[in-house]
Amino acid sequence: MNVIVVGGGKVGRKLVEDFNYEGDDVVLIDIKSKICDRIQDDYDVRCVCGSGTDLETLREAEANKADIFLSLIHI
């Protein structure tokens, strides 16, 4: 499955870990490059640094191909 997770906090990171473990293709979107770098170092996932509400970021993450899209950000 193609999974996009927006937000690399505690819950987002755990979901990235679980989906990655199951062999799914995971893309993480986070506005903080430190979080993207850390998660990319720990898991075999692609990271897009940017806002999950920005159309260019969503295009780069190929959101149109997602089977699952999870937004885990707080406002």
Give a label for each model feature.
Residues 1-73:
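Cytosolic regulatory regions of ion transport systems
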